[in-house]
Amino acid sequence: SYIWLYYMTHFPELPLRIYNGGIGGDCASHMVFRFDSDIKIKKPTYLVCSFGMNDSGYDGYNKPGYDKYANKQVEYANTEFGKLQQQILADKKIKNVVLLGSSPYDENVKLEGVETLHGKNETIKRIIEMQAEVAQKRGWGFVNFNTVMCELNKEIQQSDSTATFCGGDRIHPDKDGHMVMAYLFLKAQGLAGKEVAYFHINATNRKAMEERNCRITHIKNENDTISFSYLSRSLPFPVDTIPRWGTKGTARDAVRQVPFMQEMNQEIMKVTD
């Protein structure tokens, strides 16, 4: 929803429809099973796929021989992903494909009463490596959430061992984690540095010297007061400060750790003379 909200505020005239074809608990095999009914029927032109968290499994960790279990999970994910690739390639309406490397399973955060599945994130990373290789081979887009989010978790845990962008169960990100992922996705699309709007007014001449993504009219400079009419073609992204459903993280927490505001949410006014 954060990605959709960014598009809506920054590109209000863009004819865009976004469909969620996923269901919680999915893995690559489920995506294959429901591709026709969930995806193809909607006739998308741009497809974003994410899997890995559930494909890496749960029950086989913290047991002797877990490495064999991990190998089996990766092999099965690879097999099912191969089937998914063929379904995607056969759908000629799909012009662009992006693969998302899963958010991490946080094995390091200190969470009371929550078991740590040691080695699970390494399995996820192996699946992500497979996704990256396929993306490069097929000319598809690729965004790796895992690496950056692991680095961010490490940073915040230096001062608070209970802090994480991966939620209260090591798996499901709170709103802060979702905001981080939205930032990484939008940055990968090349949107860093795109302003909401920028304008420069010369007060003495009562003239707009520069207008970017906006229009300035009716400039007045009277009684030590400058006034003008401002029409922007975009709106700033509203960063929420409220958690949901008993969780702790908010989008505001995320923008303290990633430069979303500086790179993607600047609305700048400059006045000279």
Residue spans for each PLM region:
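Alpha-helical cap/lid subdomain in secreted, periplasmic
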Residues: Y2-R17, D26-D273
